[in-house]
Amino acid sequence: MSQALDPVWKELREQFPATRDWVYLNSAAGSPVPRVVSEAVNGFYRDLEGGGDRLWEDWLGRVEHVRHQVARFVGAAEPGEIAFVPNTSSGINLIVDLLAGAGPVLSDEMEFPTVTLPWIHRGVHLNMVPSIEGVIRIESFSPEYAPKAATMLLSHVQFVNGCRLDLEQFGAIKAGRHFVVCASQSAGAFPIDVQKAQIDALASAGHKWMCAGYGAGFVYVKRELFEKHPPRAIGWLSVQDPFLFDNLNVRLLPSMRRTEMGCPPFGPIFALGAAVELLAGIGIEKIAERVLYLNEYLTFRLERKGFPVLSPGEGFRSGQTLVEVERPADAVAFLKERKILVTEKPEGIRVATHFFNSEEDCEALVRALGEYSRQPV
């Protein structure tokens, strides 16, 4: 029996109403949210509508519950190593605030601007490793390549072609350097264990593979790093006794909670909690297996129909498939007219298959691309 007919995956697909009307192959840009996520957010706003902030204490308790959930999800040693941020950009900037003075950074030329621009803006020297046929090679990050580098900066999965790195292999060669990871294109699709991979800091959005919607990101910072390089920005909820309102005698929180500063964005945080509960309930290993299966299936079908696939092959696959097509912008518009969502890239279109997708989604794309390729220019 194919995985598409498995009743478990069929039931999970029904959690995503968007799949009724759309062939949704765009989770690398932003995924639709499942019912459990919209219910969590709507429930919060119904409470707010009906009673203002009467549930303030309950909401704060739920925030800490989500912090525990996220910590377990990424393998953090403790919840205090997790902070909530609205997006990856905020998370990376927070990390840069901690490490900008540590020294040069070793990164790669394929990174999304958010990953590198904050370092450059702060005057940090970046050594940019070139890719080799669309792949970031681990030997390029050996200590000998840039002996003065204080930090290794990488994305778990690259946004442009889906190249997925083995974080544990890279962590094993850190050799005293800080290891900073962007996980926006992998969190929710592939396992992450920050301790096993020896990651010092990690940032992720919630609106992509996490299926949590916009505004629900998170950042992990290892306690030792946080204590050695404490953040500078604080607010009224950065202290241990915020309701004393004693501005001259405060005790700062000894955890990453300090960086959240003010009133929490409860809705997005509760959305993230509902998404993590769903993903953890399925099992991230099972999700990864499903994602890779669909990627392999789609790649086979595309290549068989003569569409070149530019994403790296075995050992580097993810949920993204970069397909070479003529006039990518026109192709995206053509597909959207047929209720198929993908993303334009300079070389072609980026297709993202998540666990809620199916073989029929892949077949619909292949058929539509066949129609597009036969259109007169």
Across the structure, where does each feature detected by a protein language model lie?
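Pyridoxal 5′-phosphate
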Residues: M1-V377
